[in-house]
């Protein structure tokens, strides 16, 4: 195992960069400066990646270094280059506009950077502490803006970056959109902390996170998210807690596959009959019509400085509102397959890492467990909400894969 040590001053710089990347990636800065904090988060993620790549070059095996340096460069670079090229060729758009419009994918470099740094001396416990501190800061940040922002004025603002922060319906009124992924992971992890608290401070912190997350949910009341979380909590002890339980899942898989059309039809009807369902139905039809002739690479990545999807398709058309169909619209069948592969890869790595940590330490890692449960919940809602294709999901996915892979290296037999 590599045993390089980080100087104290460099360690604190790394942890600070990690906080910025996570806070911005989970969209904590979207409430001010038109989310310009995201650019700082991207720069922080790239800095961590370059530093990890530099240290790994001297301390890691060549095969491992290539996998965690060249692999992410080819994957992220390929997504950005291909999607920008496709859009610019089909609609005479500016390549650079589309390329930089996809810059949120650069947040994916955070995970490889953290993995490489942990493999070359950064204590993984420091990473966990920064993640929990960031989750807590995101919750406090959200509540501050919820209590101080004029939500009605923001909702009717002519500035799209401001109006997009608030949603409204007659039942729940005006609601400020939260950093949902981080809050749900915090809620799940805090639950595990309460049940296996390893000290008074951990117990108090877990209760504080639970209280904040519960209060935020009482504001936003995202029922579909809560339903999938509860379903994931039910599935975990039945199918995912032990390797032997997975055999039961394999036995039941034919029945589950047979029930998919019924479940999908019910979910689709609920999706379309909800508020705005008529617009979603037209958006679905427009996407399917487009994919008939552009099924391989899709439409590519649009930008705010040229023709957008609303100019090309319809004013009401937003791919992010129509689930996996929207992903296929943007990136084609190739992008859709790549998305499903990455989703499965992250989920499987988290499952293995959770078993590994529990077998090695005798208890659960609350963060790994929470990430596994959230990915399981995302799987149930995958068709309608492919969240890993956007900033919050990219940040969560890359962090989850890095932590899971690092845990698996800890449990691997020494060569």
State what each model feature region is.
Residues 370-415:
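Transmembrane alpha-helices of multi-pass inner-membrane enzymes
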Residues 220, 237-275, 288-293:
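A membrane-periplasm/extracellular boundary helix in multi-pass inner-membrane enzymes
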Residues 333-379, 405-406, 410:
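Hydrophobic transmembrane alpha-helices and their immediate junctions
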Residues 1-85, 122-125, 195-201, 352, ...:
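Transmembrane signal-anchor hairpin modules in multi-pass inner-membrane enzymes, especially those
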Residues 85-93, 125, 139-180, 312:
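Membrane-interfacial helix-loop-helix modules of multi-pass inner-membrane proteins that assemble, modify
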Residues 68-81, 92-117, 129-135, 139:
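Aromatic-anchored transmembrane helix interface
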